[in-house]
């Protein structure tokens, strides 16, 4: 019997003593049938190298606050508990354990970070914990029965960037700069697969650490390669630093980056150097008139007025909304609120609109929730769609996880 099962047993025993004979007794931790409240939680980098990622968590919290204010999810209120992990994978595991054993969460929801979420997988499997909407992109998520990721594998996104560069912009000399962790390695896998299928060799491939602030040597390698374009997969601080290094060296490059850097916070870091950068994005533009995106803008302005309205927030909102969609489907099914039934409800989600994402689908054995991306471009402090949504390049999307 694992720790989670022991917690379920002790919780059910306590409730039975208080409410003998009640048909509403919970057999899952994090479920309060009397108050009709579900407790979920996540880890987030309030400290460490990327504290601005807390914007993601604020937006997820704004989603739950907004839902609760409107009567909850099918009448159930959500208590959302978040703890700082400093963007340190070792701490993330400890935080996940604390959330289960001390805060008694029903599911891990919208936890932030690729490497951090990957590190938490063994504990989540051991403890029977569902991970819904991990805010990171890695192939490790897609075959796990207890994980429902909304974000794509960054390899698919890197392949989408390369596809647009080659097929639409007719570029051939492309360099990749990639964060030396699971985020960047995932991007590199997809990029390499697409380039190989296109019979075009990358002119350079340069790893960097997430804490890198000076990209001078990295950009020197890119410039010396004769690259026409550079695809960077790292944080918005990394992108801004790379753009500044390129500017200092007068390196003329067409830049590409992942969706989460298409955010007002990146303009604050990079200024007008960001203009012209392309971004692959599984999310609708933040200024979309779609009701779910409008709801995000209104809620984050209400609950976190100091936060910018941007893709970081829409990302967090959408991952929280994924839990809302799956939990709502579980309630509609009429089945007991258990972890197993939550997984079953998730596996039945088909072509769903979830926050700023569309056509989200999960089936048993295939948890690749997001299946298409658009291309955005930075223009004058905004992000404009320059190519509509299309499926990910099959060579990356259908590749077996490494």
Give a label for each model feature.
Residues 94, 139-140, 145-250, 286-294:
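Extracellular/periplasmic Venus flytrap/periplasmic-binding protein
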Residues 27-29, 52-58, 70-141, 208-215, ...:
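Beta-alpha junction/loop-to-helix N-cap segments that form part of ligand/metal-binding clefts
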Residues 26-40, 73-77, 166-172:
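Immediate post-signal peptide segment of exported/extracytoplasmic ligand-binding proteins
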Residues 85, 132-133, 138-139, 210-211, ...:
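Venus flytrap/periplasmic-binding-protein-like
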Residues 243-317, 389-400:
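Extracellular/periplasmic periplasmic-binding protein-like sensory domains
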Residues 5-25:
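N-terminal export signals
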Residues 30-34, 41-60, 83-90, 112-115, ...:
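Extracytoplasmic "Venus flytrap"
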Residues 302-313, 324-386:
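Segments of small-molecule ligand-sensing domains
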């Amino acid at each position: 019997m694992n720790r989670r099962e022991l917690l379920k047993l002790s919780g059910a025993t306590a409730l039975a003593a208080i409410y003998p004979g009640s048909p509403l007794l919970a057999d899952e931790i994090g479920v309060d049938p009397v108050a009709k409240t579900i407790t979920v939680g996540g880890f987030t980098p309030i400290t460490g190298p990327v504290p601005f990622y807390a914007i993601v968590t604020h937006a997820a919290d704004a989603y739950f606050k907004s839902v609760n204010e409107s009567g909850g999810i099918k009448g159930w209120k959500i208590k959302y508990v978040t703890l700082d992990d400093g963007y340190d994978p070792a701490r993330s595991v400890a935080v996940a354990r604390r959330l289960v054993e001390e805060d008694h969460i029903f599911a891990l929801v919208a936890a932030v970070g690729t490497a951090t979420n990957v590190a938490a997988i063994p504990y989540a499997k051991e403890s029977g914990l569902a991970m819904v909407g991990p805010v990171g992109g890695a192939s490790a998520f897609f075959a796990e029965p207890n994980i429902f990721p909304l974000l794509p594998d960054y390899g698919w996104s890197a392949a989408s960037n390369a596809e647009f560069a080659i097929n639409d912009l007719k570029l051939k000399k492309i360099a990749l700069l990639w964060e030396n962790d699971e985020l960047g390695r995932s991007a590199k896998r997809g990029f390499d697969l697409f380039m190989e299928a296109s019979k075009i060799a990358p002119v350079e491939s340069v790893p960097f650490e997430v804490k890198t602030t000076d990209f001078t040597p990295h950009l020197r390698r890119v410039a010396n390669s004769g690259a026409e374009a550079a695809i960077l997969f790292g944080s918005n601080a990394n992108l801004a630093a790379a753009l500044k290094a390129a500017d200092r060296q007068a390196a003329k490059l067409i830049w590409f980056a992942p969706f989460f850097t298409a955010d007002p916070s990146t303009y604050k870091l990079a200024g007008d150097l960001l203009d012209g950068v392309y971004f692959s994005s599984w999310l609708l533009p933040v200024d979309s008139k779609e009701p779910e995106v409008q709801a995000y803008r209104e809620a984050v302005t209400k609950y976190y007025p100091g936060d910018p309205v941007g893709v970081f927030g829409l990302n967090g909102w959408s991952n929280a909304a994924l839990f809302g969609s799956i939990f709502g489907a579980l309630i509609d099914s009429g089945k007991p609120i258990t972890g197993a039934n939550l997984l079953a409800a998730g596996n039945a989600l088909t072509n769903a609109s979830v926050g700023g994402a569309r056509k989200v689908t999960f089936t048993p054995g295939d948890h690749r929730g997001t299946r298409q991306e658009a291309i955005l471009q930075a223009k004058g402090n905004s992000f404009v769609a320059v190519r509509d949504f299309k499926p990910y390049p099959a060579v990356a999307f259908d590749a077996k996880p490494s």
